Amino acid sequence: MTLANIKSAKKRAVQSEKSRQHNASQRSMMRTYIKKVYAAVAAGEKAAAQAAFVEMQKVVDRMASKGLIHANKAANHKSKLVAQIKKLA
């Protein structure tokens, strides 16, 4: 239910809700990939961390290119995680 009375405003409300749900799903998926890298680093598994990082990098870059997150946030995630992976023996 929306408060909109004008037809175009009602349509925009429906579209906004649909995109909000889609974006929430995409953000959740991105966070899951990031957590996988952190988990591998915490376990000390360098090979697993590197493999998870490659997958995470694809997802984060795609989210940044679509405007879901800022490009700088994507860069911060990647640089922080690659530094932690390099610290592993």
UniProtKB/Swiss-Prot annotation:
Query: What domain of life?
Result: Bacteria
The name this protein goes by in its record:
Small ribosomal subunit protein bS20
Which keywords fit this entry according to its UniProt record? Ribonucleoprotein, Ribosomal protein, RNA-binding, rRNA-binding
Annotated source species: Mannheimia succiniciproducens (strain KCTC 0769BP / MBEL55E)
* Gene Ontology terms, MF aspect: small ribosomal subunit rRNA binding; structural constituent of ribosome
The family database entries (PANTHER family) matched by this protein are listed as:
30S RIBOSOMAL PROTEIN S20 (PTHR33398), SMALL RIBOSOMAL SUBUNIT PROTEIN BS20C (PTHR33398:SF1)
Protein's job: Binds directly to 16S ribosomal RNA.
Residue span of region Disordered: 1-28
Family recorded in the similarity comment? Belongs to the bacterial ribosomal protein bS20 family.
Q: Does the keyword Protease apply?
A: no
